[in-house]
Amino acid sequence: MGIDIRHNKDRKVRRKEPKSQDIYLRLLVKLYRFLARRTNSSFNRVVLKRLFMSRTNRPPLSMSRLIRKMKLPRRENKTAVVVGCITADVRIHDIPKLTVCALKLTSGARSRILKAGGQIMTFDQLALAAPKGQNTVLLSGPRKAREVYRHFGKAPSTPHSRTKPYVLSKGRKFERARGRRASRGYKN
């Protein structure tokens, strides 16, 4: 008598639609689903996939990083595309003229880009201007910049681990012996 194959782990877990009920996001999904199907452009497929992502997987992009990435060679006069939010950076004084397309911009970022003579587009405007993603640079924020990633990895109390422990308090008596001082076993 044969053994039934266990089918409970067969499912490929990936999003086929956004979790959000935001009607404007869902309209963009409709548009980019059409473009991904009808054009042979990988740009539209990537944008569609990113529209499905959770907020933690769509980290914000600061203006300083945006400017740095757009200053790279052969990127002048191209549109920066961010499937997420662009945030202002007060440390940056002079902002070049940029053409930007993003899901959201903070009010500070929006005013500074426009003041520098730049242009801000929405994704439906981008679909008309560049239906195949021509002359665009697809950017995203640093996904691993969240504080929670410091706690991931090799266990905190093991040799050569740089993982941040979850501690109740940062006092003298908390997690200060083994692994923190050479006289107590080892020091990382």
UniProtKB/Swiss-Prot annotation:
PROSITE patterns: RIBOSOMAL_L18E. One of its GO terms (biological process) is cytoplasmic translation. Residues 178-188 have a biased composition (Basic residues). One of its GO terms (molecular function) is RNA binding. Coiled coil: none annotated. Residues 153-188 are annotated as: Disordered. It holds the Pfam family Ribosomal_L18. PANTHER family: 60S RIBOSOMAL PROTEIN L18, LARGE RIBOSOMAL SUBUNIT PROTEIN EL18. Component of the large ribosomal subunit. The ribosome is a large ribonucleoprotein complex responsible for the synthesis of proteins in the cell. This is Large ribosomal subunit protein eL18A. The gene is rpl18-a.
